[in-house]
């Protein structure tokens, strides 16, 4: 009987811990989720520890450094990358056009004024993009240069 009560007590504590953790995650707002740079920026509003009547903004910046990343990710023979540069303003910019209604007119606008067409340096593969490279293939004594997929799942349809 004691084991039965102990089991239910532990189960209740576990369920409460899971619900509290899930509740904290739900309050976070994702500001940026850049898979190319391996960065995720979130924020949430929490009560101030000094003054319970005030709220403060807490920001979480998660950066995953791909240790074996190459200078040119499409070229496996390029040297290993040793310098990683992150600009928060670049990570959080939203350049996709959005339709906004102004004075009963629908206008297309961008949420950032620093958008340019320069392709950003990627530190990891974007799994939704097809990366290829030309490599030498020797078969039957002959060497040919062939195009190969570095991310086959995104290069070939199902």
Curated annotation (Swiss-Prot):
GO terms for biological process: humoral immune response. Keywords: Disulfide bond, Glycoprotein, Secreted, Signal. GO terms for molecular function: immunoglobulin receptor binding. Its main location: secreted. N-glycosylated. N-glycans attached to Asn-72 varies from truncated, differentially fucosylated to sialylated (NeuGc) complex types: Man3GlcNAc2; GlcNAc2Man3GlcNAc2(Fuc); Gal1GlcNAc1Man3GlcNAc2; GlcNAc2Man3GlcNAc2; GlcNAc1Man3GlcNAc2; GlcNAc1Man2GlcNAc2 and NeuGc1Gal1GlcNAc2Man3GlcNAc2. Disulfide bonds join 36-122, 95-115, 130-155. Glycans are attached at residue 72. It is found in: Secreted. Residues 1-22 form the signal peptide. GO terms for cellular component: pentameric IgM immunoglobulin complex. PANTHER family: IMMUNOGLOBULIN J CHAIN (PTHR10070:SF2). Part of the secretory IgA (sIgA) complex that consists of two, four or five IgA monomers, and two additional non-Ig polypeptides, namely the JCHAIN and the secretory component (the proteolytic product of PIGR). Part of the secretory IgM (sIgM) complex that consist of five IgM monomers, and two additional non-Ig polypeptides, namely the JCHAIN and the secretory component (the proteolytic product of PIGR). JCHAIN-containing IgM interacts (via CH4 domain) with FCRM (via Ig-like domain). Serves to link two monomer units of either IgM or IgA. In the case of IgM, the J chain-joined dimer is a nucleating unit for the IgM pentamer, and in the case of IgA it induces dimers and/or larger polymers. It also helps to bind these immunoglobulins to secretory component. This is Immunoglobulin J chain. It comes from Equus asinus (Donkey).
């Amino acid at each position: 009987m004691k084991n039965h009560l102990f089991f239910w007590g532990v189960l209740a504590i576990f369920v409460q811990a899971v619900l509290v953790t899930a509740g904290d995650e739900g309050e976070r707002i994702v500001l940026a989720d850049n898979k190319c740079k391996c960065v995720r920026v979130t924020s949430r509003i929490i009560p101030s520890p000094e003054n319970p009547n005030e709220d403060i903004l807490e920001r979480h910046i998660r950066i995953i450094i791909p240790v074996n990343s190459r200078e040119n990710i499409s070229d496996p023979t390029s040297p290993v990358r040793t310098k990683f540069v992150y600009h928060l303003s670049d990570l959080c910019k939203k350049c996709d056009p959005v339709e906004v209604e102004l004075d009963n007119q629908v206008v297309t606008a961008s949420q950032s004024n620093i958008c340019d067409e320069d392709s950003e340096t990627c530190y990891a593969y974007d799994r939704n993009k097809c990366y290829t490279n030309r490599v030498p293939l020797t078969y039957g004594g002959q060497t040919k240069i062939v195009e190969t997929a570095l991310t086959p799942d995104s290069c070939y349809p199902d």
